[in-house]
Amino acid sequence: MKALDQLTFDNRFARLGDAFSTQVLPEPIADPRLVVASESAMALLDLDPAQAELPVFAELFSGHKLWEEADPRAMVYSGHQFGSYNPRLGDGRGLLLAEVLNDAGEHWDLHLKGAGQTPYSRMGDGRAVLRSSIREFLASEALHALGIATSRALCVIGSSTPVWRETRESAAMLTRLAQSHVRFGHFEYFYYTKQPEQQRVLIDHVLEQHYPECREAEQPYLAMFRTIVERNAELIARWQAYGFCHGVMNTDNMSILGITFDFGPYAFLDDFDANFICNHSDDRGRYSYANQVPIAHWNLSALAQALTTVIEVEPLKEALGLFLPLYQAHYLDLMRRRLGLTTAEDDDMVLVERLLQCMQRGGVDYSLFFRKLGEQPVAEALKVARDDFIDLAGFDAWGADYLARCGREPGNAEGRRERMHAVNPLYVLRNYLAQKAIEAAEAGDYSEVRRLHQVLARPFEEQPGMQAYAERPPEWGKHLEISCSS
């Protein structure tokens, strides 16, 4: 493992030139102090976890110091926000500090969020508050532990720097890791500003660095777009299967890598509600849980439009047509596994849909239902789960069909509990748990943030003394809508 001064840098995106980003130095925050760090994220950089305890760690990730090899850049892009095109967005408070090359040959972006004003700040102060920084840290690491593709969070650094949102809060910086920070909106920017040469440079960069397997295809650009469609189909299937609501699926928040990116007012479902809206600014429900599948397809079509400079329209349409069937296949596979099924039958999707309809009628905690279902033999588990349902007749009918379906599985029930527990988390990042940790951190106590992070790092394993993190939320903690304010 390495010390901070032993990291290797290779700033590929910065070398593309000033048409793609602007060099900006971070603005330091006062009295930097470590709030929380992720050892598993540090390992991606080959970084010794003990480095997080050194004063220089907080200084480097709060803008006070820079590596000599760093080339901090604010990236320019545009995007569709709530369906309307915004011609110039860009990194308004974040900087791509550098790209680290690890010993495995992987490049990882170091992105500092809350680093101060940039040419793209759009009247903002360029800061991030402690509250939103902790939320992104927890979500990144929780999703990773669930097996959902996501950007990673290296650390959160707190400060005494005041910032004003609805009230006075303290500034913080979050260091995000991803193998690229290129968004759908990057391609939209060069398309709508009619810069075809820069557009092609960017496409070639993404193809070369992130989709090298597509270079030998007969149509490399089309092969790359098809792979992006495939990755997003799997990503959204995992969101839906695990009840994750992103909240702000604007095209500038969509990663070209097909990973969860740019967290805002996200939430995991508590009681199942297909129409749940986690963002209180989303008054029309554009980004509700139920709409995430069609919105992902819409966003991919926006990307396809931006790529018409290098790919013919009809092949793009054909590639877009892959999204829904791929999504459905991934989603059904995940839901079969969550139900403990190891084989496929034609009516399995109907079985899943009937279960969700029963849940929708009220009273059922989405995550805990699946965990309970695997605790005991099927008949006994159904009796226990029944108590949570309002639609008892509907659940009884479903339960009878599910019991019969399980009876057609090959072999016996040996290993069913282990199989189901391996895919059904006991611990989920619920907004009320995050809020309690944030309130403690705002009072200067970071222990709850760190404890919650450690629990969520092993979501499928029962952890002694951590039962409180596996309980149903209190009524006040359910279906919290979160502000975009950050």
From Swiss-Prot:
Question: Which EC number(s) does UniProt give?
Answer: 2.7.7.-, 2.7.7.108
Which keywords annotate this record? ATP-binding, Magnesium, Manganese, Metal-binding, Nucleotide-binding, Nucleotidyltransferase, Transferase
Cite the binding residues for ATP: G90, G92, R93, K113, D125, G126, R176, R183, D262
* Residues where Mg(2+) binds: N253, D262
* MF terms (GO), sorted A to Z: AMPylase activity; ATP binding; magnesium ion binding
Instruction: Name what cofactor the protein needs.
Output: Mg(2+); Mn(2+)
Q: Which reaction does it catalyse?
A: L-seryl-[protein] + ATP = 3-O-(5'-adenylyl)-L-seryl-[protein] + diphosphate; L-threonyl-[protein] + ATP = 3-O-(5'-adenylyl)-L-threonyl-[protein] + diphosphate; L-tyrosyl-[protein] + ATP = O-(5'-adenylyl)-L-tyrosyl-[protein] + diphosphate; L-histidyl-[protein] + UTP = N(tele)-(5'-uridylyl)-L-histidyl-[protein] + diphosphate
Entry-linked InterPro entries: SelO
Identify which residues the record assigns to the active site.
D252 (proton acceptor)
Protein purpose: Nucleotidyltransferase involved in the post-translational modification of proteins. It can catalyze the addition of adenosine monophosphate (AMP) or uridine monophosphate (UMP) to a protein, resulting in modifications known as AMPylation and UMPylation.
| Protein family membership | Belongs to the SELO family.
What protein name applies here?
Protein nucleotidyltransferase YdiU
What taxonomic ancestry is recorded?
Bacteria, Pseudomonadati, Pseudomonadota, Gammaproteobacteria, Pseudomonadales
